[in-house]
């Protein structure tokens, strides 16, 4: 993956972007990994994020997620999260396997490194965003 490390110096992140970020301490404890993560930005500061039966709702409106395959949706019980000011809610696209904000909370703006703009591996997934 290639990420634009400068974009968030000038622009606010947008919902749906794939973001590289420094892992918060809770993520290191819950996921057993540290350093950086790559996840999709789902919730913006002030949003209420609810996941019910594999569907995500932002402020009680269904979020269109054409990038999530039906077999990758998580069927956990309903979860509700309020995104604090200056923080972002991240989720992986493979919801059943992803260790993300549902497990360890939101990500502070200062932890955002950049937006992914190109994928070059594996070769069958080469794309520009």
What are the roles of these predicted feature ranges?
Residues 1-129:
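Soluble "head" domains of membrane/secretory-pathway proteins
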């Amino acid at each position: 993956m290639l990420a634009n490390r400068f974009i968030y110096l000038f622009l606010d992140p947008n919902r749906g972007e794939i973001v590289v970020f420094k892992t918060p301490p809770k993520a290191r404890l819950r996921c057993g990994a540290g350093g950086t993560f790559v996840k999709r930005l789902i919730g913006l500061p002030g949003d209420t994020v609810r996941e019910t039966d594999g569907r995500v709702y932002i402020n009680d409106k269904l979020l269109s997620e054409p990038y999530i395959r039906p077999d990758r949706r998580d069927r956990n019980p309903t979860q509700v999260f309020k995104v604090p000011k200056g923080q972002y809610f991240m989720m992986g696209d493979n919801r059943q396997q992803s260790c993300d904000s549902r497990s360890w909370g939101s990500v502070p703006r200062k932890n955002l490194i950049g937006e992914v703009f190109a994928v070059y591996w594996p070769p069958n997934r080469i794309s520009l965003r």
